Design a protein with these regions (language model features):
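C-terminal peripheral helix-coil segments that are non-catalytic and often amphipathic
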Residues: 1-2, 134-138, 169-242
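Helix-turn-helix
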Residues: 17, 25, 29-59, 63
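Alpha-helical DNA-contacting segments of helix-turn-helix folds
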Residues: 59-68, 109, 124, 128
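Short, Lys/Arg-enriched C-terminal cap helix and immediately downstream tail that follows
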Residues: 62-63, 73, 190
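Hydrophobic alpha-helical connector segments
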Residues: 63, 77-104, 142-146, 179
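Amphipathic alpha-helical segments used for helix-helix packing
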Residues: 98-123, 134-137, 161-169, 199
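Amphipathic alpha-helical packing segments from all-alpha helical-bundle domains
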Residues: 117-146, 150-162, 176-191
């Protein structure tokens, strides 16, 4: 009979294990509610050994949330193929997968809870927002985005973040509906901006020309057309004068 010998982990391997264990615990409870003792027990090591790999609780929490931030930013990566609406819908699916899997940790990352210093948390989430912004700009195929386009994309990224945080508080709206709604929100933000700027109008028209009727943007137009006849017209005296 052969007796198994427990392999000793290297320093980096052990650090990565502890980060993974911490993230798993953060998926169930807020980071500030998770103790080093719990992380040590889940990793199968002693509390002093945790401090051998991380100088303090703060450094372990920062490392764990940094990995979460990197993973969240990666959810916005998408091949540059197919209509934009379908691409954004896939991105939102992966984004909400992350939110669903790491609820308390996601909230802590976005809100900069006491487990992580505010400056560190802000730097992490700013990195996620910038990565998301750059990905969307790349999908739009605009080398030098005008100011209005930057405003649209950054506003939409913030909207996705806020929507996810609100959804986590009770999950009162079906997730799939929110994913689609956020894609529609992007189209709406872009369309409103296009109404004020010729360059934005050109970008929006180019995007819509590549969208199929059964895609997310086509669905939005169908929904708007469906209720348009029932909307009372604006009285002539209330229309803005040109």
């Amino acid at each position: 009979m052969t007796t198994g010998v427990r392999r000793r982990m290297g320093v980096d391997e052990r650090r990565q294990q502890l980060i993974g264990v911490a993230l798993d615990l953060f998926s169930r409870r807020s980071p500030e509610d998770v103790s080093i003792d719990e992380i040590a027990a889940a990793a199968g090591i002693s509390r002093p050994l945790v401090y051998h790999y991380f100088p303090g609780k703060q450094s372990l929490y920062e490392a764990a949330l940094r990995r979460a931030a990197d993973e969240l930013a990666a959810r916005f990566l998408e091949p540059l193929e197919g209509p934009l609406g379908a691409r954004l819908l896939r991105v939102m699916g992966r984004f909400f997968d992350f939110v669903d899997e790491h609820g308390p940790g996601f909230s802590a990352l976005m809100r900069g809870g006491p487990a992580v210093g505010s400056s560190t948390a802000n730097a992490m989430i700013d990195g996620v927002r910038q990565a998301a912004y750059e990905q969307i700009i790349t999908h739009l195929g605009v080398a030098e985005p005008p100011a209005r386009l930057e405003l649209v994309v950054r506003s939409w990224v913030s909207l996705a973040e806020s929507t996810a945080l609100i959804w986590l508080d009770g999950r009162r709206i079906p997730r799939a509906e929110l994913e689609t709604q956020l894609v529609h929100d992007f189209a709406a933000l872009a369309a409103v901006s296009a109404a004020y700027d010729q360059e934005m109008a050109g970008i929006v028209l180019r995007v819509l020309a590549q969208e199929p009727a059964d895609g997310p943007f086509g669905e939005l137009l169908a929904r708007l057309s469906a209720f348009a006849p029932d909307v009372p017209a604006v009285p002539a005296q209330r229309l803005p004068r040109r």
